[in-house]
Amino acid sequence: MIGITTARTAATPGRRMALAALFCAAATAASSMPARAAPVVAPDALVRQISTEVIDTVKADKEIQAGNIERIIALVDAKVMPHVNFQRMTAIAVGRPWRSATPDQRARLQAEFKTLLVRTYSGALTQVRDQTVQLRPMRARAEDEEVVVRTEVRGRGDPIQLDYRLEKTPAGWKIYDVNVLGVWLADTSFKSQFAPVITNSGIDGLIANLADLNRKAARN
């Protein structure tokens, strides 16, 4: 059984706020949107845009502040998911077994993983008040296909490190992992939790495990 260890370890008010409000949560259904002809937004500008839009929406929406899960999911789907390569994020978290998963298994994994992220961190959105996001200088070349955008979330208390891995796609820059206080969620946290479940029960066992966690979270 997955214990969502890192989710809970990172669930102090500041940490939960950072992850829920500025990413998922998450991050996270397949998230790639159809490519549209539009100017390519620089990766650091994209992160600033997403962060600002999410924080402003939460501050203006009393139902989200009260923990309305439907409104939170709608916010994530509207403001975050179009800018996330969630298939890649899920593949990273699952690791090598992703390669042998069937299309149906992959779709179910992505759906359950997204629900897990959103439900795990949704309560933190109620804590968004006066936080701001400061981008740190980005080291990247114009030809780079992957970059890391480093930010700090500032409010009451110490600044919170929140970094993003992005890849350049025909549809623009997409986020595929998030680092909260030094821990990459997909590549470190969830991968370490998923691995023993897959070893013992396979991909279907992981899907069932995630579904069970989501059912329990929905009842709370």
Region locations from a protein language model:
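N-terminal secretory signal peptides that target proteins for export/translocation
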Residues: 1-13
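Sec/Tat signal peptide C-region and signal peptidase I cleavage site
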Residues: 31-39
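Early exported N-terminus immediately downstream of N-terminal targeting peptides
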Residues: 40-121
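Extracytoplasmic
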Residues: 49-52, 67, 75, 81-84, ...
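Surface-exposed, charged secondary-structure patches
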Residues: 118-160, 210-220
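Short beta-strand edge/turn micro-motifs at domain boundaries
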Residues: 159-189
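Low-complexity, intrinsically disordered terminal/linker segments enriched in charged
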Residues: 179-220
